[in-house]
Amino acid sequence: MSKVHLIESPYALDKIKGIGPKRLALLEELNIKSVEDLVLYLPTRYEDNTVIDLNQADDQATVTVQGEVYSSPTVAFFGRNKSKLTVHLMINHIAVKCVFFNQPYLKKKLELNSIVTIKGKWNRNKQEINGNRIFFKDQKNQEDTHLEPIYRIKEGIKQKQLRDNIRQALSDVTIHEWLTDDLREKYKLETLAYTIQTLHHPINKQNLLRARRTYAFTELFMFELRMQWLNRLEKTSDEAIEINYDINKVKQFIDSLPFELTDAQKVSVNEIFRDLKAPIRMHRLLQGDVGSGKTVVAAICMYALKTAGYQSALMVPTEILAEQHAESLIQLFGNTMNVALLTGSVKGKKRRLLLEQLENGTIDCLIGTHALIQDDVVFNNVGLVITDEQHRFGVNQRQILREKGAMTNVLFMTATPIPRTLAISVFGEMDVSSIKQLPKGRKPIKTSWAKHEQYDQVLAQMSNELKKGRQAYVICPLIESSEHLEDVQNVVALYESLQSDYGNEKVGLLHGKMSAEDKDQVMQKFSKHEIDILVSTTVVEVGVNVPNATFMMIYDADRFGLSTLHQLRGRVGRSEHQSYCVLIASPKTETGIERMTIMTQTTDGFELSERDLEMRGPGDFFGVKQSGLPDFLVANVVEDYRMLEVARDEAAELIQSGQFFEQQYSHLREFIKQNLRHIRFD
């Protein structure tokens, strides 16, 4: 079937008036490659040009007012090509002076006794407006409100040009309706054609809100249809491998561990084991706070697979983390399991031998990075795929790994506790196991907040820990200095400063621009206690495990979100020794102050994730752009979570009733298939 579109156009993008080769190239840089892309290129915000009563305006506020020109404008020139135009208006019986800089041409347009609309900053004391825009329209033609769409543009494209291009396209395209009449009527939604038209050219705020609501619901409904359909396919299209593990051997392995499992770990293991025995594929998320022992739970599951004659795979986002997982699992398993590590650094003969052993079944458990999904990586009999920190991988990467075993059980792990609402959006409908309990003997990390001027006191506190034979992390937001962020400390400068204080041999440097080999060398030195202080960016955020490190200083901590701060803090507190985390920050915003306060009040990652989500929104919540979240144009899974739940219920009903698979929905089914490029539906 040919490509299914939401919007169909009778002509190509370059047939629109004003779009020549040069404009076409600029539009392509904005990812606008078709008329459909142009129509769906929605405004990022709206400038409210509603005329207001000046008596109600706050001092220094940006206002839009209308008045009569009662004195001829004057222009004064100064400096080099600079000018100041002054005109007096009568606005609501108030004489107001209006000033425009470097717009002398306005003088000819500002006729005496004419009615004009001006936008600018209001100075109540001076009774003066510093104007930035002027509208020449007769008063009776002014609309009660005027919301002007503002688009993200590039140099070479003007707002008005883009608005005109979109206006022409809208007049000629056909916009298909995805929602049924019953659904629109039930939730009082508009047609999609009217909605898109309104998002580009709203008449008033109420009109815009209705359009936003309709488009958001449509996006959420389409997304949930995909998720519900995929969920149905995953549970019905393939029979799962039934893992007949040897429970006695598994119990012996658990008893041999050098520590006792927490109650939360035991519950999670039992939940996963029930899934492994079930006739449908496991699709479970294991989430737990930093240091809660998720890796041990994963290890027990891998061991169970081994007793049943199956291989396991564990994919992690970084080489450092892959190496640490491999090291800890080799230590846990001893001679009972053959664990192999596959990263981009494994090359040549060593790689060929590893792949040969993987394919003939000699390797029981393969741990690695993106290298696991390369075409030449072939398993003999994989029964369990575990993805750690899944939100850091694209859908495509996860899907390829899963397809290496057609009926494979899947376990996702994350140390970023995800609120239930967001978990559904990121991972789809799946079972969730949560570990909310730390291993015995762990002491809660003591977190404090210090201002920049208290830096020397923080250094003294760190020195005390070093004297006890402990180690420390020092975290910075930037690698090198930035002219845009002059007040933010950078990791290189702080590294050099600490070297002069503690000696070159005692301080290590780690950041994302270093080669994998260099990063590994520094981490190995820190792990072996060859260096005392590791100065780093957030590259240490996930999974780095050095139990002897008991002190962390996070410089310019207000530059990070709560979840990132909590992940960083989790690098300490991994032994029986008391650990400390000091946040150095002088926040200038209420949000920054609130963030620092919350961090000192709780060490509960689940509570922090909820607060972070409220404060930052889903995109920032994970600290990365490619967070695995659906890329909505209008909907926001946090603000619109009630709508998300309604959309999910409606989508589930449509899928479960079987109506979705009737002829009337064939167009919609094909659209969903084509827009889930990384997921197979056959």
From Swiss-Prot:
Keywords associated with the record: ATP-binding, DNA damage, DNA recombination, DNA repair, DNA-binding, Helicase, Hydrolase, Isomerase, Nucleotide-binding
Catalytic reaction equation(s): Couples ATP hydrolysis with the unwinding of duplex DNA by translocating in the 3'-5' direction; ATP + H2O = ADP + phosphate + H(+)
Residues given in the record as ATP binding sites: G288, D289, V290, G291, S292, G293, K294, T295
Family annotation (InterPro entries): ATP-dep_DNA_helicase_RecG (IPR004609), DEAD/DEAH_box_helicase_dom (IPR011545), Helicase_ATP-bd (IPR014001), Helicase_C-like (IPR001650), NA-bd_OB-fold (IPR012340), P-loop_NTPase (IPR027417), RecG/Mfd (IPR047112), RecG_dom3_C (IPR045562)
GO molecular function, one term: DNA helicase activity
Location of the Helicase ATP-binding domain: 275-435
Region listing for Wedge domain, in residue ranges: 50-145
Chain location of the short sequence motif DEAH box per the record: 388-391
The Helicase C-terminal domain, residue ranges: 454-614
EC number of this enzyme: 5.6.2.4
Gene Ontology biological-process entries: DNA recombination; DNA repair
Residues in the signal sequence: none
SUPFAM superfamilies, sorted: Nucleic acid-binding proteins (SSF50249), P-loop containing nucleoside triphosphate hydrolases (SSF52540)
Homology family: Belongs to the helicase family. RecG subfamily.
Domain observations: The wedge domain within the N-terminus inserts into the replication fork junction, where the lagging and leading strand split.
NCBIfam families, per database record: PRK10917.1-3, PRK10917.2-2, recG
General function of this protein: Plays a critical role in recombination and DNA repair. Helps process Holliday junction intermediates to mature products by catalyzing branch migration. Has replication fork regression activity, unwinds stalled or blocked replication forks to make a HJ that can be resolved. Has a DNA unwinding activity characteristic of a DNA helicase with 3'-5' polarity.
Subunit comment: Monomer.
The protein's name: ATP-dependent DNA helicase RecG
Protein source organism: Staphylococcus epidermidis (strain ATCC 12228 / FDA PCI 1200)
